[in-house]
Every structure is written in structure tokens, then in C-alpha cells.
Amino acid sequence: MKKHIIYFLMLLPAVFIASGCQKYETGNPPASTVANFTFSTSNSGKAPCVVTFTNTSLNAAGYLWDFGNGQTSTEANPTATYNTPGFYTVKLTCTAVNDVYYNQLVKTAVINVRDPNAGLAQVLYYTTCATAGGAVHMVVLNDDGIAHVQDFAPVTLVKPYGITTDTSNKKVYVSDYSVNAIYRFDADGTNPLKILDITIFPALDAPEGLMVAGDKLYWGQPGGIYRSNLDGTSPELYKSSIDYPADMHYDPVGNKIYAVVDMEDGTGGYFSMNFDGSNLVNHIPGVDGLAIEVNVATGKAYFAGYAVAGTAMPDNGIYTSNIDGTQVQKIGEYGLKATWGVAIDDKRGKLFWSFKNSNYAPDGKIIRANLDGTGKEDWITGINPQAMQAVWIKL
């Protein structure tokens, strides 16, 4: 009997140990919180761009984002806008569901917003009229403020009212209202090629405003916005909701089109719409816009307006407004004849516009001023300027 008691006492601790081990191994620990995210950028990661964040965190009760640009958010999947090149440290802090030591509540990542102008030259391209025919010119902008004009290879032009650039492929496009043609040049003004005329596209009619978006060229003419491939092939009507865009501006970040509409052959007005044609808004009805430039970074739009009594632009002149069309004000004169030229030097905060007193005589000039119209100077004189655009491009 004594022997059995000894055996029982020896086995008793083992029973308790086995029971304790079994309970520990089969239990479930509280779930941890793990912060994590991925992101994608618009505009190929070049400023300005929008970064979209996708939250992949586990078991979180809340979120606090610090985007490194002065902005924060508590949304699960936010977006952030970066207007300036640089490195930005993004920090996501999650609120834990359970207070356990193995939570991972913070995730950081560095976003490199690239400089879109690195290795590029800033160039003002513009067209002119003359009795002997129209022409295209360029000026490389620099800090000395001196206009060193270079001429493009000659082509047949009479009223070159539209100009735009394809910076990705280093090309310049010019439309002629009178000749019914669109030409393409290399960025340095060489290798001219007529890519569209009425023999190629019989519907081509008095093309004016031009813009490039992606792999397409867009232009305005009676009937709406038309487009083709960048080499002029496959021309077609794109959108008829704006009846005659005299000039257009494409915002790649917001994916929007801004346009002014000719009053003589169209309904007039300053419009914006999503790139797919949705959300069409007439911000300034009835105005006769000839040229437009939009500065998305400052929230301002600039126009060459032809006088229409009873509208926000009752006199000929250069106007500015907020992008939504509010606070319209006149900031300059463009002479006795209508002009199709407005451009912005975004590096130096300058505005250019065409000034002319006749249709063909060299009695005009390009005026340069501050963005509010102050500090005007006659920058290039003895010309008859028409359309213009300032861009960063590789020559």
C-alpha cells in the first residue's frame, strides 16, 4: 500500500504539467494589428502628380496618414497631391484593436516625385503672319530675359492660329485656319511635314486650337473637338459637346480639358469637362474666347477675349479668372486686332501675349508681364504674332 502511495505522488506533478502544457498550446492569442500600404502615381511620377494609396493593413481600428507634404488624412484609402519635385516620407499609423506587444502600428515609405523639367529646355514657340506668308519661331527662355529668336523651316501658312507640342516625342504641331492644314515639326524647327489637310481628311475645316494628350493630337474646328494619331492617321470627331474650340488646354493631372469657344462660328463661353466628355461646365457663358492658358498650380486661367457687350469680357483684352470662372478681371490690352496667343513662363512667373494692330503688317509685338498683368514690357517687336505656347522640352 505504501508503495502505491509513493507511485501516485510521483505521477501527480506530471499530470498537472501535462494539463498545463495542453491548455497553453491549444489557446488563440489576441490578433495583432499590422500597418501596411501600397501606392501608385499619376503623371509618371513627375510633379505635379496625384498619389493614390491602397491600404493593406490588417486588423486596424483607424488610420492616420502623414503624406510628408503638410497634408494628413484619416481615410482608409486616401489620395495626396504633390506639386513640387522631391522626396516625401509617407507615414501610416494604425489604431490597434488589441493592446498586444507584437502590434506593428507604423508603416513608412519614401515617394520620389521627379522633376519634369530635368534635362529639358524651356521654349516659347509662336507663330506669325505676314503678307509673304506665315511662319513659326522659337525662343529658348533664360534668366537674362533676352529673346533670341530662331525660325522654323518654312511651310505654307496664312493664318496659323493654333500651336501645341508633344514633349514626349519632341514634336511641335501648327494648325492653319485658312490653308486647312496641320503641320508637324521637330522641336528644333526642322523636318516639317504636313500631316493633315482636306485631301487626307475632307472634313478638316478651319482648324484652330491644338493639344496633345497621350498618343493623340486634338484640334478644334466647327462641329467640336477632333482628333487623330500623332502622325495624322485615323482622324475622327472626338466630342461635339463644345461646338468650336478656338483654343484648348489639357490638364494631365486632373484629366480635364479647358476650352474657349469661338463666338462667330460657335456659341462662345469658357468651358471645362472631364477628358471623357462628362461633367461639361460653361464657367463664363457668352464670352468670345480666342486663346486660353490654365495654371493649375495657382488655380488661375488666362484668356484673350474678343469684346461681347453684356458679358464678363465686354472689351477686347487679356483677362484672368479663377479656374472655375469666378473673379474675372482684365489685365492687359492686345491691340486693334484679335489675337490667338497667351502663354505662361512658369519658372519666372511671367505671362506672354500677342499684341497686333493689323492682320499681316509687322506692327505688333509679344508683351511679357507678371502674372497679374503688372510690369508689362515689349519683349519682341516688329512682328505680327498669333498663337503661342511655352513648354519644357528636350531639343
Question: What are the functions of these language-model segments?
Answer:
Residues 130-133, 178-180, 263-266, 307-312, ...:
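Short glycine/acidic-enriched loop and turn motifs that connect beta-strands
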Residues 125-127, 173-175, 218-220, 258-260, ...:
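Residue position within the beta-strands of beta-propeller blades
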Residues 121-123, 168-170, 214-215, 253-255, ...:
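Short coil/turn segments that connect the beta-strands within blades of beta-propeller domains
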Residues 151-158, 195-203, 238-243, 282-287, ...:
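Surface loop/turn motifs at the tips and blade-to-blade linkers of beta-strand repeat domains
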Residues 135-138, 181-184, 224-227, 268-272, ...:
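A short loop-to-beta-strand structural motif that recurs across blades of beta-propeller domains
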